[in-house]
Amino acid sequence: MEEAEKPAALDLQKLLNTRIVVHIRDGRKLNGTLTQYDEYMNMLLEDVDETMGDKPANKYKILVVKGGNVQAISI
């Protein structure tokens, strides 16, 4: 019996070139455009607004997010 391909919990392909909010384990939120990702959920975001709690923190033109630091993703 062949093993069926497992569906991904989150299909990042559908979110490419879309603004998303990445919730980081340390409480930060990154609001940016998803331009690339890999099988480890490492992501490249562009035009990123970082917030800590409700306070704006930083702005980044390009930011790499390590998949292991991601708690959740919302759109």
Where do the protein language model's features map onto the residues?
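Conserved RNA-binding domains used in RNP assembly and mRNA/RNA metabolism
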Residues: 1-75
